[in-house]
Swiss-Prot record:
The gene is purA. It is an enzyme of class 6 (ligase). Homodimer. It comes from Trichormus variabilis (strain ATCC 29413 / PCC 7937) (Anabaena variabilis). This is Adenylosuccinate synthetase. SUPFAM superfamilies: P-loop containing nucleoside triphosphate hydrolases.
């Protein structure tokens, strides 16, 4: 039995969907613990592409129980569309469970999110406009609507009468938008409630029961460490906690019950939206990575900014999340390059900095210090073992592992399940030893 968290070690879009899908083969339960429809994951199975925003990746395995935890915010309209899409493809959704205490994104959340971003002008933060931030804001202000409220028509109508009255003041007076009709919103969301009712349970209790029965549980995060509300590049962050610690809060699980943490990083770095990005590449090289990596957002379709691998944020993600091992994705995107650069440290105002600065203003002044490695310039997408990789690619992976001081357990070389090298068992492998008895760093790349 193992309880494993999968987290993004960069700014999201690292390939967590594929890695979670792979690991779901060994999982009895897959749980999504934070975020909402502002994140998406793409899974390719036997040439068929699935794009999901709320439903956990494990839904493609018929015997795997999938849960949406209390730390997520749920847009019922999107969730029902995903259910309908899967069922139209004869994929069963009967094993999907939804936390009754998860908060619900309402129409006024989306309207306020978009209007607020437009009002920011040059100070925009790059929101997806899906209402995620305002939903979490209402949760913090204790005025939010939870899934269990949808199940009680009288309670929903009473709560929305007060809430929409207040939200209409904001929509009309601040943003010059038309008001919402309370009864129309109530009717719409009661319809959603009936469709979702069979899936709604106390997921925290279900998770605890699965642990008692010694089931393998996989906790799936959305976005990435550098988008974490507390530990990311604030204010250019999301409104929840994608880091490993968020899995406990977002599911109702005690921290002593977590066995392993697996981080996912691309072999280079990408970012969507606003905010500092020290290794960002402009010009032809950035375009090459974007084209070869198909770097367009699953949720918004926005073009992702591309850059070299940043080991400074990599080490930070290892530390913040207590990672036991890493999965490196999209190694094949680098196949054509003659040289590859890796950021090993920053220079800030003439001084070397080996650690991630907590100030976004200071981070914006960081200039990357690079180490240049030779490329391999041969295709790797058909490699299935470490021995199949060209030596330069293997050297590159070893260098990343040394810089981040964590083993690499999985190497992904394409979108399909079979385009993967499993270096060590990421679920049942050993806990990471920080140091050997003699004080030297622990094993870096298992082989």
């Amino acid at each position: 039995m193992a309880n494993v968290i999968v987290i993004g070690a960069q700014w999201g879009d690292e390939g967590k969907g594929k890695i979670t899908d792979l690991l779901s083969r060994s999982a009895d339960v897959v749980v999504r613990y934070q975020g909402g429809v502002n994140a998406g994951h793409t899974i390719v199975v036997k040439g068929q592409t699935f794009k999901l925003h709320l439903i956990p990746s494990g839904i493609l395995y018929p015997d795997t129980e999938c849960m949406i935890g209390c730390g997520t915010v749920i847009d019922p309209q999107v969730l029902i569309k995903e259910l309908d899409q899967l069922e139209s493809l004869n994929i069963s959704t009967k094993n999907l469970l939804i936390s009754e205490t998860a908060h619900v994104t309402m129409p006024y959340h989306r309207l306020i999110d978009k209007a607020s971003e437009e009002r920011r002008g040059s100070h925009k933060i790059g929101t997806t406009g899906r209402g995620i931030g305002p939903t979490y804001a209402d949760k913090s202000e204790r005025t939010g609507i939870r899934v269990l409220d949808l199940m009680d028509p009288a309670a929903l109508r009473d709560q929305l009468a007060w809430t929409i009255n207040n939200k209409n003041l904001i929509l009309e007076k601040l943003y010059n938008l038309p008001p919402l009709d309370t009864e129309e919103v109530v009717k719409e969301y009661l319809g959603y409630a009936e469709r979702l009712r069979p899936h709604v349970v106390d997921t925290s209790l279900k998770i605890y029961d699965a642990i008692q029965r010694r089931r393998n549980i996989l906790f799936e995060g959305a976005q990435g460490t550098l988008l974490d509300l507390d530990h990311g590049t604030y204010p250019y962050v999301t409104s929840s906690n994608p880091v490993a610690g968020g899995a406990c809060v977002g599911t109702g699980l005690g921290p002593t019950m977590i066995d392993r943490v697996i981080g996912v990083s691309k072999a280079y770095t990408t970012r969507v939206g606003e905010g500092p990005f020290p290794t960002e590449l402009d010009g032809e090289l950035g375009e090459l990575l974007c084209d070869r990596g198909a770097e367009f957002g699953t949720t918004t379709g926005r073009k992702r900014r591309c850059g070299w691998f940043d080991a400074v944020i990599g080490r930070y993600a290892v530390r913040i999340n207590g990672m036991d091992c890493m999965a490196i994705t999209k190694l094949d995107v680098l196949d054509e390059l003659e040289e590859i650069q890796v950021c090993i440290a920053y220079e800030i105002d003439g001084d070397r900095c080996d650690h991630f600065p907590t100030s976004a203003r200071q981070f914006a002044r960081c200039r990357p210090i690079y180490k240049t490695l030779p490329g391999w310039q041969v295709p790797t997408s058909e490699c299935r073992t470490l021995e199949d990789l060209p030596q330069q690619a293997l050297d590159y992976l070893k260098f990343l592992a040394e810089l981040m001081e964590v083993p690499i357990a999985i190497v992904s070389l394409g979108a399909s399940r079979d385009q993967t090298i499993i270096v060590e068992d990421p679920i049942h492998g050993p806990k990471r030893a920080l140091l050997h008895p003699d004080g030297t760093p622990a094993s870096l790349l298992s082989a």
